[in-house]
Regions:
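Fold-independent oxyanion-binding glycine-rich loops
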Residues: 21, 46, 99, 144
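Conserved beta-strand segments of alpha/beta enzyme cores
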Residues: 24, 40-42, 139
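N-terminal metal-binding scaffold of metallo-dependent hydrolase/deaminase domains
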Residues: 1-37, 49
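Alpha-helical scaffold segments that flank or form the walls of functional sites
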Residues: 18, 67-138
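Hydrophobic faces of well-ordered beta-strands that scaffold small-molecule active sites
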Residues: 55-57, 115-117, 140-144
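Short, hydrophobic alpha-helical packing/hinge segments within bilobed ligand-binding/sensory domains
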Residues: 50-51, 129, 142
Length: 144
């Protein structure tokens, strides 16, 4: 399923998707009635839907570790008790080296293939995040 143009959803039933060794889709064709001569690496079941990767257009990377915490607090308390101290800790390259790979790998595992990240005030750890995205294969805009 995809959206080839605005406001138009197309569902492709019973197709063959050809992917090259680099992971790039090179063709999407209707499946022939006889597939015996084809090399099939992976066949999806009849109830499986294949979607393109998801895009997260606004992710504060330093807040990854506090996901779901402090939800009962007013915004100012949440910022000063959770967010700002954590963002300060993530200017440390040792801590960032532990957090960034876990975060990027988790997002990729859940289908998020592109992200616009807000990183830290540290050039070093912001650069580390960009390098992690490149290494793990996630498309990203990384800013601070």
């Amino acid at each position: 399923m995809h959206t080839p143009e605005r406001n138009r959803l197309t569902v492709l039933d019973d197709v063959i998707i050809t992917v090259d060794d680099g992971g790039t889709i090179t063709a999407i064709d209707p499946a022939p009635a006889d597939t015996s001569g084809l090399t099939v690496d992976h066949e999806l079941g009849p109830d499986v839907v294949l979607l393109p990767g998801l895009n997260d257009t606004h992710l504060h990377a330093p807040q990854w570790q506090q996901l779901g915490t402090g939800l009962d607090l007013p915004l100012e308390d949440w910022l000063f008790q959770h967010t700002f101290p954590l963002e300060q800790r993530l200017t440390d390259p040792v801590i960032a080296a532990e957090v960034w790979p876990h975060m990027v790998a988790t997002l990729l595992a859940h289908g998020t293939t592109a992200v616009a990240y807000y990183a830290t005030v540290s050039v070093a750890t912001t650069t580390m995040l960009a390098a992690t995205c490149a290494e793990l294969g996630q498309r990203a805009f990384v800013g601070r």
